[in-house]
């Protein structure tokens, strides 16, 4: 949320809402408590704390979290930084001057990496596989994910394949062939990660859907459209 276009839309949202005297809600913190890993758990709580402090400082009037275990942390941040019921009158954000160009400034802060490409493939397949089996919210790598995550993942891969800037930091070009080679490798990782739970999802079907989505030269509007066709 600190990249240029994301901060721009967040602050514009606050300004727009407060001009109309309505509440500007912050976003969801996807982190969830991590069992049996004290360091990872502490990192998750630290990320949520920083996220909610940023939202309250920007001028949001409330927020939400993905897990009830994070409610008290979010509440503490807002109670401390927003002692009033809301910030509608206090932070009109007339200082915010956001243009269309600001909202379209998507320059990445870091290069595309093989690890990032693989993570997009892995997470998208995990989510779609669980979605086909009836789950809408899916814990993946200590984050509570919904369809938006899989949408971002498959959209980035689709774009990297077709963009002249779709190159990894080592100079290799992201291609359909590269992604096709990585899909079975990531499937093996998912199978190993989930163990017996692998059979509870529909991951083989998910990998086919993902491959079809990124290989289709016409960008499919929503990944759930072809996925719905596989639901009885």
Predicted segments with their positions:
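Expand to "…catalyze enediolate/carbanion chemistry for C-C bond making/breaking, isomerization
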Residues: 1-232
């Amino acid at each position: 949320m600190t990249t240029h276009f994301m901060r721009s839309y967040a602050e514009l949202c606050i300004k727009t809402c407060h001009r109309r005297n309505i509440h500007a809600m912050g976003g969801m913190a996807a982190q969830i408590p991590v069992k049996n890993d004290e360091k990872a758990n502490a990192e998750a709580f630290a990320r949520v704390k920083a996220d909610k402090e940023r939202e309250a400082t920007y001028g949001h009037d409330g927020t939400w979290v993905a897990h009830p275990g994070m409610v008290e942390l979010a509440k503490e941040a807002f109670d401390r930084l927003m002692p009033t019921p809301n910030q509608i009158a206090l932070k009109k954000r007339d200082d915010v001057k956001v243009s269309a160009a600001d909202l379209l400034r998507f320059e990445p802060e870091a290069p595309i990496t093989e690890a990032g490409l693989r993570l997009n493939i892995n997470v998208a397949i995990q989510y779609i596989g669980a979605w086909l089996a009836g789950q809408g919210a899916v814990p993946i790598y200590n984050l509570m994910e919904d369809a938006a995550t899989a949408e971002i993942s498959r959209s980035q891969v689709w774009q990297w394949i077709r963009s002249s800037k779709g190159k990894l930091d080592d100079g290799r070009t992201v291609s359909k062939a590269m992604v096709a080679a990585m899909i079975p490798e990531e499937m093996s990782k998912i199978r190993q990660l989930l163990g017996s739970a692998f059979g509870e999802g529909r991951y083989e079907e998910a990998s086919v859907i993902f491959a079809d989505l990124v290989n289709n030269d016409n960008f499919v509007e929503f990944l759930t459209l072809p996925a719905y066709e596989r639901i009885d």
